From Swiss-Prot:
Domain notes: The hinge domain, which separates the large intramolecular coiled coil regions, allows the homodimerization, forming a V-shaped homodimer.
SUPFAM superfamilies on file: P-loop containing nucleoside triphosphate hydrolases (SSF52540)
Subunit composition and interactions: Homodimerization via its hinge domain. Binds to DNA via its C-terminal region. Interacts, and probably forms a ternary complex, with MukE and MukF via its C-terminal region. The complex formation is stimulated by calcium or magnesium. Interacts with tubulin-related protein FtsZ.
Protein location: Cytoplasm, Nucleoid
Species: Shigella sonnei (strain Ss046)
Binding site residues for ATP: 34-41
Keyword Nucleotide-binding annotated: yes
Location of region: Flexible hinge: 666-783
Domain of life: Bacteria
Keyword Nucleotide-binding: yes
Family classification: Belongs to the SMC family. MukB subfamily.
Keywords associated with the record: ATP-binding, Cell cycle, Cell division, Chromosome partition, Coiled coil, Cytoplasm, DNA condensation, DNA-binding, Nucleotide-binding
Name of the protein described by the UniProt record: Chromosome partition protein MukB
Length: 1486
């Protein structure tokens, strides 16, 4: 059995109180006993410092304030040291019986911070006889010694044979050596690990349950599952690398697209310019020849235009002279027309106003009568209203007087007075002083008869007045008519003048009736006169155009001659037109055919390019479409064979991948069901137990266990029996072996080993012979070896698969190219060359153009002659119908005679028109002018007097009536009769008053209504008089204006004036039109001459420039062609299909490509500079240089190990194939790399279950531990609820969250974190990233919660907390937990360290007096059972029965402080033996 390593001694050099002291450590318990300040804590601090020399962790709490200021950082260490070099060394012996001394050199650093410098070192190979103090001290004399510095110590040890001295610059290296040699239980890789180790030592040193440890028990007790984490990290790294590779492929594909784009645009840019220059060179040659032809033609045209200009200038001068006369005539005719139109408008107004005046005269007379009647009625109404008013006033006065008398009993007196007043008023009005009440009735009858007589007389006068007024109105009307016609005259002359006017009217009316026939006759003669003048003008113009004068008799013969000439020229022109049409038709047919061929040529050229590419790719020549289809069949067969071979290689590669995946399973399980069964049975796979077997031993153990190499090792087979019932989900043969998985050996079988084979005696009658497998798979090393060979095979298969995939894709692309060719170009690829036919047709077209030009020149002369003859015939056709007018000489005299007669008739018509209505009105009433009614005014005065007399008689009668009515008031008999009479009179008065008021109201209403009506009649009358006067005045003004105009406004005058004006306007327009035509033609001719002159100069200049340009371009083109041929790029640039595009299209194509290229080469300085230089249009060879630079740039970027070609175009095609294959392969690899969520859950669950089992095993070691009331200690491990739900979802409901795990944007860790957040939205994740959270969730320790429980007294199991336990119980419980932690660390580190080493176990306990004797005995028992060393510090009253005890006493001797140490080893029957080195230390050298 492997012995456990032990700490032999602790050596302190130059510490406070210890100059050179070595403490031999007991194998179990070492007790440091002494009072306060004896040096117990200093000793333990020295041990801890040598064990963990990390100043960031060291913190000795009981002396922190004593040895350092507030700014100190030594945490209590500075005050424990003396000045100078100090050492703390541990002498150990490990399981291999190797002596190892490890320690630190400490030295105070001067300064206010009181820092301490620490240097760790290790010594190996030191003989057992050499003590640690002998190494670091040098004896000067019997009483003095010197501490050696570290460099002298190094030199001293190097001088000793076999001794190795190592000085460490980092604490990690120091601890790494200590771990490898078995001094510490755990490899401390980082500051975090060192902190955990220090917290453990600190917790044991000061005792109790450390909160720092209990809070992080998972980190102390649960080992980090680095394999699982590494597997996940490797998987994510592989996935990340795979995705990065895929992204790189996408980038490469974009680079490929960029290359493709660069080649395409560079080709378009340069080829378009190249073909444009080629086209322009040919065009320039054609233009030079064309310029020469145009130069000759233009000179001829200029001479013809000069002759034409002279003729038109002469004709223009003639028309300019005639235009002035025509303008004067036209202006006079326009003015005359305006006067006629004005006179007609005036005449129409006069007629309209005369009609209005007649109507107003009638209405005015009617209105006068209406107003007179209204005045009479108004006067009557006024009299009636006045009488009614007087009667009402009288009645009101009587009634008021009567009421007043009645009130004061004087009614009769009042009535009497009223009667007397009425009598007096009647006397006054009637002029009757003797009138009495009795005679009133008689006088009333007299005055009523007088009133009746006055009324009859007034009516008689009114009738006479009406008749006189009518006669007076007729005389005035007739007199006004005579005045209107003849002017002012005396009233007595009206009768004679009126008769003379009526006779003159009859004569004027007869003359007016002849106006229309005379006007028609004049119009006819004037029209003939104008036609005669037009004929004379046409004849003069014709003679001028013909260049000679012709008589009237010669015109008909000349007309026949010209018609004969037209017929002959027409035949010639017609024949020439047919011939020209035939030539043009042939030319159009040729042009159409050429256009058709030019449209077909690019398609044919594209088909030829595609056919040539196919021929180059496959190395075959195709002469017909049948050759193409036959080769396509061969290609399909070849593709089919390559696909079959690729699939076979792919299947083998997949098989290898599956085997690699199967062998890569943790624990060596090839069947996942075995892992589940092992967990279910609480066992371990046999392959997992033998996972560490070496490669050399793998064949032996594989043969030893044979088919049972995949067995499950269980602690007790009897407990598995119940699980086997109904078990179906398992392999066909399931092997179960009973044994302890922690200490399993191969003693299960009886084995005889043969050469390369074993014989296993399973039972007495059953043996099994198994040979060593050639490829063992038992153990991790064997599997890794097999995996390595499989990886090598996979690499070969992958390379072969890649090659075959490349060939298949290349064949498929070739097949696609053939398919595209067949679909797009096969119909035209093998047709005849259209360009050859185009050249033949172009030569024929040139011949036709030459023939057409000659024919046009010949036909031009005939056309000119034909136009001249046709123009002459047209002029004669207008002259010949007017020959009789040309011979009529008296036509002008007849026109003058008729015009004079028409003037007289129009004057009579104007008189009739002006005074015809007045004469018609005057004729029926002319007789009234014989006598003038002068008595009309006297009659009006008599009528007014009669009205006044009638009004006076009516008032007198009314006054007498009132007296008669009051006759009863003149006599009253007595008072009673008076009262009775008064009552009746009152009623009568009231009735009369009501009747009188009603009558007055009616009279007022009638008066008011009639007054309003009279006012309206007067207004209408005034309006009519005003309108009549206004219109009369306007009529007089219009008649005067018409006389002032001096033009006859008959019905035909306007038409004649308009016809005359239009004729002159037509002549003027024709003259102007011809003049404008001549001016325009002359201007055009001059412009044409100027243009021809400029054109001649320009043609001469262009011709010479074009010649020079052709010569210059030839040299540049030769340089371009030489560069193209030298760099072998003519095939790329000379794209014949571009020859059929226009220069603008090619320039646009080049400019678009240039814009794209600027963006494409923006990041490439060389290409950007070359492109910028190539933009010079005068240096086309620079574009070729740019194209060559692009090809060179792409050739340099072709990976020759993958793509074996120099042509970038072919390289891009091969790159596309290779990238497509890589994309497919990496995508499949990513699918294989990705681990499923269920697998993750199973791995974490299995790890949790394994660790729970391990904690249970650790708990078994603590079952018998007791301290005070604590009977037992245990650890509880539970899975957190939130994390358990996460595991359930991962294993059972993972399909609901595939959106996370199938996302390419999320790693598995990030997807896991997102799922955790989705399941637990209430938990705040803080500032942590999903990647960090996911990595934590992949650590199984974060799924567990751990807590310490104690079984204390009657409380049972409860959570271990400092407040619930006594001090001793807390110390004992904490020590038990620390022991468990140390044991857990050893188990965790067993695979990392050599198997022949068992590490040292040592813990501390300061102030152990807090434990009772039973608890201390328990600690001793625990140390013995666990082979653990323990250092205890206690007061003097502690006397352990076992172990080694040191008694420490601090003394001061001669101002020097030192610690006196006495050591005792246990209690025995003999006297205690003094341990070596227990004497007092020598004094320190000053």
């Amino acid at each position: 059995m492997i012995e456990r390593g032990k700490f032999r001694s602790l050596t302190l050099i130059n510490w406070n109180g210890f100059f050179a002291r070595t403490f031999d450590l007991d194998e179990l318990v070492t007790t440091l006993s002494g009072g306060n300040g004896a040096g117990k804590s200093t000793t333990m601090a020295a041990f801890v410092t040598a064990l963990i020399p990390d100043l960031t962790l060291l913190h000795f709490r009981n002396t922190t304030e004593a040895g350092a200021t507030s700014g100190s950082r030594d945490k209590g260490l500075h005050g424990k040291l003396k000045a100078g070099v100090c050492y703390s060394m541990l002498d150990t012996i490990n399981s291999r019986h190797q002596r190892v001394v490890v320690g630190v050199r400490l030295q105070q650093v001067a300064g206010r911070d009181r820092k301490v410098d620490i240097k760790p070192f290790a010594i190996q190979g030191l003989p057992m006889s050499v003590q640690p103090t002998q190494l670091v001290t040098e004896t000067l004399n019997e009483r003095q010694a010197r501490v050696l510095p570290l460099n002298e110590l190094k030199d001293k040890l190097e001088a000793m044979e076999g001794v190795q001295f190592k000085q460490f610059n980092s604490i990690t290296d120091y601890h790494s050596l200590m771990f490898d040699l078995g001094i510490i239980a755990r490899r401390l890789r980082s500051a975090s690990d060192r902190s955990k180790f220090y917290r453990l030592i600190e917790a044991s040193l000061y005792g109790g349950i450390s909160s720092a440890i209990t809070r992080s028990l998972r980190d102390y007790l649960l080992p980090e599952n680095s394999g699982v984490r590494k597997a996940f990290q490797d998987m994510e790294a592989a996935l990340r690398e795979n995705r990065m590779t895929l992204e790189a492929i996408r980038v490469t594909q974009s680079d490929r697209d960029l290359f493709k784009h660069l080649i395409s645009e560079a080709t378009n840019y340069v080829a378009a310019d190249y073909m444009r220059h080629a086209n322009e060179r040919r065009v320039h040659l054609d233009k030079a020849l064309e310029f020469r032809r145009e130069l000759h033609t233009s000179r001829q045209q200029l001479a013809a235009e000069q002759y034409k200009h002279v003729d038109m200038a002469r004709e223009l001068a003639e028309h300019n002279g005639a235009e002035g006369d025509l303008e004067a005539d036209y202006q006079a005719a326009s003015d005359h027309l305006n006067l006629v139109q004005t006179a007609q408008r005036q005449q129409e107004k006069i007629e309209r106003y005369e009609a209005d005046l007649d109507e107003l005269q009638i209405r005015l007379e009617e209105q006068n009568e209406v107003v007179a009647e209204a005045i009479e009625r108004q006067e009557e109404n006024e009299a009636r209203a006045e009488a009614a008013e007087l009667e009402v006033d009288e009645l009101k006065s009587q009634l008021a007087d009567y009421q007043q008398a009645l009130d004061v009993q004087q009614t009769r007196a009042i009535q009497y007075n009223q009667a007397i007043a009425a009598l007096n008023r009647a006397k006054e009005l009637c002029h009757l002083p003797d009138l009495t009440a009795d005679s009133a009735a008689e006088w009333l009858e007299t005055f009523q008869a007088k009133e009746q007589e006055a009324t009859e007389k007034m009516l008689s006068l009114e009738q006479k007045m009406s008749m006189a007024q009518t006669a007076h109105s007729q005389f005035e009307q007739a007199y006004q008519l005579v005045v209107a016609i003849n002017g002012p005259l005396a009233r007595n002359e009206a009768w004679d003048v009126a008769r003379e006017l009526l006779r003159e009217g009859v004569d004027q009316r007869h003359l007016a009736e002849q106006v229309q026939p005379l006007r028609m006759r004049l119009s006819e003669l004037e029209q003939r006169l104008r036609e005669q003048q037009e004929a004379e003008r046409l004849l003069a113009d014709f003679c001028k155009r013909q260049g000679k004068n012709f008589d009237i008799d010669e015109l008909e013969a000349l007309h026949q001659e010209l018609e004969a000439r037209i017929a002959s020229l027409s035949d010639s022109v017609s024949n020439a037109r047919e011939e020209r049409m035939a030539l043009r038709q042939e030319q159009e047919q040729l042009q159409s055919r050429i256009q058709s061929l030019m449209q077909r040529a690019p398609v044919w050229l594209a088909a030829q390019n595609s056919l040539n590419q196919l021929s180059e790719q496959c190395g075959e020549e195709f002469t017909s479409s049948q050759d193409v289809t036959e080769y396509l069949q061969q290609l399909l067969e070849r593709e089919r064979e390559a696909i079959v071979e690729r699939d076979e290689v792919g299947a083998r590669k997949n098989a290898v991948d599956e085997e690699i995946e199967r062998l890569s399973q943790p624990g060596g399980s090839e069947d996942q069901r075995l892992n589940a069964l092992a967990e279910r049975f609480g066992g371990v796979l046999l392959s997992e137990i033998y996972d560490d077997v070496s490669l050399e031993d793998a064949p032996y153990f594989s043969a030893l266990y044979g088919p049972s190499r995949h067995a499950i090792v269980v602690p007790d087979l009897s407990q598995v029996t119940e699980h086997l019932e109904g078990l179906t989900d398992c392999p066909e043969d399931l092997y179960l072996i009973e044994g302890d998985p922690q200490s399993f050996d191969d003693s299960v079988f009886s084995v005889d080993e043969l050469e390369k084979a074993v014989v296993v005696k399973i039972a007495d009658r059953q043996w099994r012979y198994s040979r060593f497998p050639e490829v063992p798979l038992f153990g991790r090393a064997a599997r890794e070896s097999r995996i390595e060979s499989l990886h090598a095979e996979r690499e070969v298969l992958s390379e072969r698969f890649a090659t075959l995939s490349f060939d298949v894709q290349k064949t498929q692309r070739l097949h696609q190219a053939f398919s595209r060719f067949i679909g797009s170009h096969l119909a035209v690829a093998f047709e005849s060359d259209p360009e050859a036919e185009i050249r033949q047709l172009n030569s024929r077209r040139v011949e036709l153009e030459r023939a057409l030009s000659n024919h046009e020149n010949d036909n031009q002369q005939q056309r000119i002659q034909f136009e001249q003859a046709k123009e002459g015939v047209t002029a004669l056709n207008r002259i010949l119908p007017r020959l009789n007018l040309l011979a009529d000489d008296s036509l002008a005299d007849r026109v003058d005679e008729i015009r004079e007669r028409l003037d007289e008739a129009q004057e009579a018509a104007r008189f009739v028109q002006q005074f015809g209505n007045q004469l018609a009105k005057l004729e029926p009433i002319v007789s009234v002018l014989q006598s003038d009614p002068e008595q009309f005014e006297q009659l009006k005065e008599d009528y007014a007097y009669s009205q006044q007399m009638q009004r006076d008689a009516r008032q007198q009668a009314f006054a007498l009536t009132e007296v008669v009515q009051r006759r009863a008031h003149f006599s009253y008999s007595d008072s009673a009769e008076m009262l009775s009479g008064n009552s009746d009179l009152n009623e009568k008065l009231r009735e009369r008053l009501e009747q009188a008021e009603a009558e007055r109201t009616r009279a007022r209403e009638a008066l008011r209504g009639h007054a309003a009506q009279l006012s309206q009649y007067n207004q209408v009358l005034a309006s009519l008089k005003s309108s009549y006067d206004t219109k009369k005045e306007l009529l007089n003004d219009l008649q005067r204006e018409l006389q002032d105009i001096g033009v006859r406004a008959d019905s035909g005058a306007e038409e004649r004036a308009r016809i005359r004006r239009d004729e002159l306007h037509a002549q003027l327009s024709n003259n102007r039109s011809r003049r404008n035509q001549l001016e325009k033609a002359l201007t055009f001719c001059e412009a044409e001459m100027d243009n021809l002159t400029r054109k001649l100069r320009k043609l001469e200049r262009d011709y010479f420039e074009m010649r020079e340009q052709v010569v210059t371009a030839k040299a540049g083109w030769c340089a371009v062609m030489r560069m193209v041929k030298d760099n072998v790029v003519e095939r790329r640039l000379h794209r014949r299909e571009l020859a059929y595009l226009s220069a603008d299209d090619l320039r646009s194509m080049s400019d678009k490509a240039l814009g794209a290229l600027r963006l494409a080469v923006a990041d490439n300085e060389h290409l950007r500079d070359v492109l910028r230089m190539s933009e010079d249009p005068k240096r086309p060879e620079r574009k070729i240089q740019f194209f060559v630079a692009v090809y060179q740039h792409l050739r340099e970027r072709i990976r020759q190990d993958i793509i074996r070609t120099d042509d970038p175009v072919e390289a891009i095609e091969q790159m596309e194939i290779e990238l497509s294959r890589l994309t497919e392969e990496l995508t499949s690899r990513e699918q294989k790399l990705a681990i499923s969520s269920r697998s993750v859950a199973n791995i974490i669950r299995k790890t949790i279950q394994r660790e729970q089992n391990r904690i249970r095993m650790l708990n078994q070691g603590l079952q018998n531990v007791s301290f005070g009331q604590v009977n037992s200690v245990r650890l509880n491990v539970n899975v957190r609820e939130t994390h358990a739900m996460l595991l359930d979802v991962l294993s059972e409901q993972h399909e609901q969250h595939q959106d996370l795990f199938n996302s390419n944007r999320l790693t598995f860790s990030e997807a896991l974190a997102k799922l955790y957040q989705r399941l637990n939205p209430q938990i705040d994740m803080g500032q942590r990233t999903p990647q960090t959270i996911g990595e934590e969730l992949l650590d199984y320790r974060n799924y567990l919660e751990m807590e310490v429980e104690v079984n204390r007294g009657s409380d049972g199991w409860l959570r271990a907390e400092s407040g619930a336990l006594s001090t001793g119980e807390a110390i004992g419980t904490g020590m038990s937990i620390l022991v468990m932690v140390v044991q857990s660390w050893e188990d965790e580190s067993r695979r990392l360290r050599g198997k022949d080493i068992s590490p040292c176990r040592l813990l501390f306990l300061d102030e152990a007096a807090r434990l009772d004797a039973r608890s201390i005995a328990t600690l001793f028992e625990l140390c013995e059972r666990l082979q653990m060393q323990l250092i205890i510090a206690a007061p003097e009253n502690i006397s352990p029965e076992k172990g080694t005890t040191y008694k420490l006493v601090r003394k001061v001797f001669q101002n020097t402080e030192h610690v006196h140490v006495v050591g005792l080893r246990g209690f025995a029957p003999q006297l205690p033996e003094t341990l070596p080195g227990s004497d007092e230390a020598p004094s320190q050298e000053s």
